A protein has these predicted regions:
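Hydrophobic transmembrane architecture of multi-pass small-molecule transporters
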Residues: 2, 8, 183, 387, ...
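Transmembrane core module of solute transporters
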Residues: 13-73, 77, 82, 96, ...
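Structural signature of transmembrane alpha-helices in multi-pass secondary transporters
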Residues: 29, 61, 65, 92, ...
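Small-residue (Gly/Pro/Ala) motifs that create kinks and tight helix-helix packing interfaces
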Residues: 40, 153-165, 415, 419-423
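Cytoplasmic loop-to-transmembrane helix junctions
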Residues: 53, 138-145, 396-403
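Helix-loop-helix hairpins in multi-pass membrane proteins, especially solute transporters
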Residues: 69-208, 225
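Membrane-embedded alpha-helical segments of multi-pass transporters/permeases
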Residues: 97-101, 182-190, 249-253, 352-356, ...
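Helix-loop junctions on the cytosolic side of multi-pass membrane transporters
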Residues: 186-206, 253-262, 429, 494-503
């Protein structure tokens, strides 16, 4: 018997092509969350900025994307799911082109914000559209396709970013979106019009949205600029901190009292949701901070090319792809708190392994923690998502999922900023301590006896001290993140035991 599709115009080859276009669009957006990670040293070198400033290229995209996630439902209801999807694709493609043309950090960050704002709605809308064009009995396969692109994107991102940066230039990590974006836009306009949703006049919480942008923007600016401006010795950093704190409090009060809040914070009344999202945010912040820091350390200290840094970073992909379906099945049969706790503590152990990395570590010594991390990530991500969405009422699932994704993305941006800032700050402290304890004359004499000139010895010593200081600082960051993972793994036990493990929705 032939399966009836929701839309007669979308069946057979056209349905498969439409699904491919939607999945490819999601893949392109997800890819851009990690493709720039290994290219940061190339970008900072080309634009003559510090590594801390270079990280803004990653965090600006993540923050802009996070801000747009809560607006997706309103945009789709007001203008139509397909229209918003196509408009987002067009904007994402245009801003990708502009990112490639950028010749200053300010321009690049500005265009990355535009890219994130346009790309933010594409991920949830791609999920919605796949569910919409496939019949009910094919929804599992549709979500499998969506999940595959969501998982594969971050794995291929570092590899593609490294290959492109080494063999072409960093500009091409953005230019490669052009042909993909144009094809997806044209195909979506041709195929998806029939799947358009009805539009209704919806009120938007403009005050809440403004407050959200205000406190998030102030917080991220404080984290990104704090290092350069000597933190709270700077008036501007104090102003940003006060703006973020006051803005957050006013935002909470407003959202709790508004009839149509941009973010439904009332779902935090469910203890299971509040605790699981806290653990998820802590875990993802430490995870994303690590994967932003590692490629930079490899290239700065171990003389890895961007390509090889990408290969090493991507070794975690095998475990993630292998374990995701297994963990999804285990989550229906076992207490997800135990699975999540196991995953988070395993991530803590893996990150602790990195805290003992040295400048003479070989590829496999560096790759093993990455491989083990790949196996651990599904254990914390899938069960925590299930606990969170299984703790709220049926009618609250959509807003809870949006809020969870928003906080996860924000935690990633904050984690990346903290990682690079602490790394840079502690490197200066470590260097100062090493220099004060270094017997320079003895080292110089040893180098002179080995044929080095007097002029070159100081440069060699300085370079060695810098490398060791940067590595010690990276070890310090990994130790802090290991503690965060373990703390999150213990906190999850404060969640009430799920009443029906098998009945919880997966995400």
């Amino acid at each position: 018997m032939k399966t009836q599709t929701p839309f007669a115009e979308l069946s057979g080859g056209r349905l498969i092509l439409a699904a491919f276009v939607i999945a490819l669009s999601n893949f392109m957006v997800v890819l851009d969350t990690t493709i720039a990670n290994v290219s940061v040293p190339h970008i900072t070198g080309n634009l003559a900025v510090s590594s801390t400033q270079g990280t803004w290229v990653v965090t600006s995209y993540a923050v802009a994307e996070a801000i747009c996630v809560p607006l997706t439902g309103w945009l789709a209801g007001r203008f139509g799911t397909v229209r918003v999807f196509i408009f987002g694709l067009i904007g994402f493609t245009i801003f990708s082109f502009l990112c490639g043309l950028a010749n200053s950090l300010g321009m690049l960050v500005f265009f990355r914000i535009g890219q994130g704002l346009c790309g933010g709605p594409l991920m949830p809308l791609s999920q919605t559209l796949l569910m919409r064009i496939f019949p009910q009995e094919k929804h599992a396969q549709a979500m499998g396709l969506w999940a595959m692109t969501t998982v594969v994107g971050p794995i291929l991102g570092p590899i593609l970013g490294g290959l492109i940066s080494d063999n072409l230039s960093w500009h091409w990590i953005f230019f490669i979106n052009l042909p993909v974006g144009i094809i997806c836009v044209l195909a979506a306009m041709r195929l998806l019009r029939v799947a358009e949703t009805e539009t209704i006049s919806l009120r938007i919480d403009t005050v809440g949205l403004g407050l959200l942008i205000l406190w998030i923007g102030a917080l991220q600016l404080m984290l990104d600029l704090g290092h350069e401006r000597d933190w709270f010795n700077s008036t501007s950093i104090i102003v940003l901190a006060l703006t973020a704190a006051i803005g957050f409090v006013v935002f909470l009060i407003w959202e709790l009292t508004d009839k149509h809040p941009v973010v439904d914070v009332k779902v935090f009344r469910h203890r299971g949701f509040a605790i699981s999202v806290l653990a998820l945010s802590l875990g993802f912040g430490a995870f994303f901070g690590s994967i932003v820091l590692i490629p930079q350390w490899l290239q700065m200290n171990l003389s890895y090319t961007a390509t090889w840094a990408g290969y090493l970073t991507a070794t975690m992909g095998f475990g993630s792809l292998t374990m995701s379906p297994i963990v999804a099945k285990l989550s229906t049969k076992h207490d997800p708190r135990a699975l999540a706790s196991f995953g988070l503590i395993l991530l803590g152990a893996v990150t602790l392994m990195r805290a003992f990395w040295t400048t003479d570590a070989d590829f496999m010594a560096l790759a093993w923690p990455q491989i083990l991390q790949g196996f651990a990530v599904p254990f914390f991500f899938i069960p925590l998502s299930n606990i969170a969405l299984g703790s709220v009422l049926q009618q609250e699932i959509a807003s809870a999922a949006g809020l969870m994704n928003f906080l996860r993305t924000m935690a990633g941006a904050i984690g990346a900023s903290i990682a690079v800032t602490v790394w840079d700050d502690h490197a200066k402290v470590a260097r100062s301590e090493m220099v004060s304890n270094l017997h320079t004359i003895e080292v110089q004499n040893t180098l002179l006896q080995n044929g080095f000139t007097a002029d070159s010895t100081l440069g060699i010593i300085s370079n060695l001290v810098d490398k060791e200081a940067i590595t010690m600082s990276a070890n310090h960051v990994f130790l802090l993140f290991a503690m965060v993972f373990v703390f999150a793994g213990l906190v999850i036990w404060l969640c009430p035991k799920p009443k029906q493990v098998s009945g919880m929705p997966s995400h």
